[in-house]
Amino acid sequence: MKYLNCFISTGLAAFFLVNSTSVLAADCSSDLTSGISTKRIYYVAPNGNSSNNGSSFNAPMSFSAAMAAVNPGELILLKPGTYTIPYTQGKGNTITFNKSGKDGAPIYVAAANCGRAVFDFSFPDSQWVQASYGFYVTGDYWYFKGVEVTRAGYQGAYVIGSHNTFENTAFHHNRNTGLEINNGGSYNTVINSDAYRNYDPKKNGSMADGFGPKQKQGPGNRFVGCRAWENSDDGFDLFDSPQKVVIENSWAFRNGINYWNDSAFAGNGNGFKLGGNQAVGNHRITRSVAFGNVSKGFDQNNNAGGVTVINNTSYKNGINYGFGSNVQSGQKHYFRNNVSLSASVTVSNADAKSNSWDTGPAASASDFVSLDTSLATVSRDNDGTLPETSLFRLSANSKLINAGTKESNISYSGSAPDLGAFERN
């Protein structure tokens, strides 16, 4: 027996005690290191049977049987494939995660061999049921990896629990927001995950975002290495949330376009909607990219609090940065080292410098190796990280190199940070 590292990402790691022939690691993990071990593995397959004991993929359990049996510190190991949840017109078909793991002993739900386990809730395109979430996560300390949720009747995942992690997951073609955190959900982390083509027929596309940590969500929610594209409303929506959300190294693009031929389409089309409804939310976004969004790339949206915006790139949105609304007395935005190209900027009530539209050098197409935005949907690397392409990378002679201001928690090479989301090494 030995430990095989299965979850390596952005400093977060979990380790499973499995047989020396790994069903988890395959070719996309590294560093065989001791750490947290599972007490038990429940092997699950799309054709699993509740009468099986789940001791191997030769005798796989059903997912529902594994959910009933699993305890903190244990692993539900999913054979890659499609897990179909039957649809009945007018009825919900939610999977509820109401158990809780513990600090240091979460409940793991992971696809084997770095594969994908797709939970298909089977809702037809125009059908929806109020609160028919795909995954309803009410418990705490769950860790999901390699899982996709599609065609749910409402949100793909609705999270009100805390200390949950979603790594290398995807939420697409659902009837509302891909993954929403609300009603007290706190200290949840979403890593290297995608949300795309989510649309709500209920309100003609005006609700379905990619990721939505919003309204009554609690403190400590964080998004790292995530992509949100071609959702009917916004990519990331932090509407009406006074609790700080942190977004790092994430991309939002082509949101708010009517891909559904809805004659009454009402999607907003912001990349990163960073607040709203006059709530005071001191959110932070760094090293992120927005392009091709119908409305704004980075949007204040009536947030009455100051937002921190450092080392981001915005290109060809309706407006690249829209921060023209009033803020509460004593509040101020903080802008450093950001790039705007091929669209306008409105920033007021801000401490702003070393951006391409103020004291920093103006950006032009020649500053970049590539502006081919089709590269944004290149497949992720095997470990789930965003693909390293030439898109928005600085050219060797770019005037944006070393043109930024040093900031805490912003790494750089050279004499000073570069402008924009990507540091040239």
Curated annotation (Swiss-Prot):
Ca(2+) 1 binds at D209, D233, D234, D237. GO terms for biological process: pectin catabolic process; symbiont-mediated disruption of host cell wall. It comes from Dickeya dadantii (strain 3937) (Erwinia chrysanthemi (strain 3937)). This is Pectate lyase L. Presents an endo-cleaving activity on polygalacturonate or partially methylated pectin. Is effective in the maceration of plant tissue, and has an important role in soft-rot disease. Is 280-fold less active against polygalacturonate than the major pectate lyase PelB. When assayed on polygalacturonate, PelL releases oligogalacturonates of different sizes; upon prolonged incubation, PelL degrades the primary products to unsaturated tetramer and pentamer in addition to unsaturated dimer and trimer. Pathway: Glycan metabolism; pectin degradation; 2-dehydro-3-deoxy-D-gluconate from pectin: step 2/5. It catalyses: Eliminative cleavage of (1->4)-alpha-D-galacturonan to give oligosaccharides with 4-deoxy-alpha-D-galact-4-enuronosyl groups at their non-reducing ends. Belongs to the polysaccharide lyase 9 family. Disulfide bonds join C28-C114. The keyword Ribonucleoprotein does not apply. The gene is pelL. It is found in: Secreted. The lineage of its organism: Bacteria, Pseudomonadati, Pseudomonadota, Gammaproteobacteria, Enterobacterales. Optimum pH is around 8.0. Its EC number is 4.2.2.2. Transmembrane segments: none annotated. One of its GO terms (cellular component) is extracellular region. It comes from the Bacteria. The active site is at K273. Residues 1-25 form the signal peptide. Disruption phenotype: The pelL mutant displays a reduced virulence on potato tubers and Saintpaulia ionantha plants. Its cofactor is Ca(2+). Ca(2+) 2 binds at N402, S413, A416, D418, E423. Pfam families: Pel9A-like_beta_helix. Changing K273A: Loss of catalytic activity. Induction: By pectic catabolic products. Transcription of pelL is affected by growth phase, temperature, iron starvation, osmolarity, anaerobiosis, nitrogen starvation and catabolite repression. Regulation of pelL transcription appears to be independent of the KdgR repressor, but under the control of PecS. Keywords: Calcium, Disulfide bond, Lyase, Metal-binding, Secreted, Signal, Virulence.
